[in-house]
Regions:
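HIT superfamily nucleotide-processing domains
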Residues: 1-190
Length: 190
């Protein structure tokens, strides 16, 4: 990058000339080399002693960003949220896959997911959700050794190019503010 080049102009100047001659797709591609470490196996292996989802319940809710504790699972704010209110439902046990969960864990993860959706609607007034689990390193899980379900509130028009071009996310509320509001919502609705 030259002295006058910004991340925006650098990204805009990258040209993608790859097209199959028989099937032009008309898509432009934005290359994100900063993700190479992640997709090439840069994720850490966690043990029960080093796993952030195993150590979080032993700390205060404020310190760990936990918004609700159940018997077999808990709900925690994502430390690296896609949107304000991005929650994770985690079993207390250090298990990597959904089919490793007991019947009681499976039931409580489902119940906490439903409750979290109600809380987020009340607190955030979102328009929809993305809900899911990435399992295993090749499945895209950032912490592959400890099962967790993402609950991502969505609003109309909440997608933009800032994360890709400027490595910046716009967040309308701090994690602390969201933790308090969501924890209060869980207290009211559970």
């Amino acid at each position: 990058m030259s002295e006058n080049t910004t991340p925006e102009t650098a990204a805009a100047s990258v040209q993608d000339s790859f097209e199959l001659p028989s099937a032009p797709d008309q898509f432009q591609r934005l290359w994100t080399p900063h993700r190479t470490a992640y997709v090439s196996g840069g994720q850490k292996d966690y043990t029960e002693k080093t796993c952030p989802f195993c150590t979080a319940p032993s700390r205060s809710d404020e310190e760990s960003l936990i918004v609700h504790r159940g018997e077999h699972a808990f709900v925690i704010l994502n430390l690296y949220p896609y949107n304000p209110g991005h929650l994770l439902v985690c079993p207390y046990r250090h298990i990597p896959f959904y089919d490793d969960a007991t019947e009681a864990e499976t039931l409580e993860i489902a119940q906490l997911t439903q409750l979290a959706m109600k809380v987020l609607r009340e607190v955030s007034h979102n328009d929809g959700f993305n809900i899911g689990m990435n399992q295993g390193k090749v499945g895209g899980a950032g912490i592959a050794d400890h099962l967790h379900q993402h609950i991502l509130p969505r609003w109309s028009g909440d997608t933009n190019f800032l994360p890709i071009i400027a490595q910046t996310k716009t967040m309308s509320r701090t994690l602390d503010d969201m933790r308090v509001a969501i924890a209060e919502g869980f207290a009211r609705l559970s």
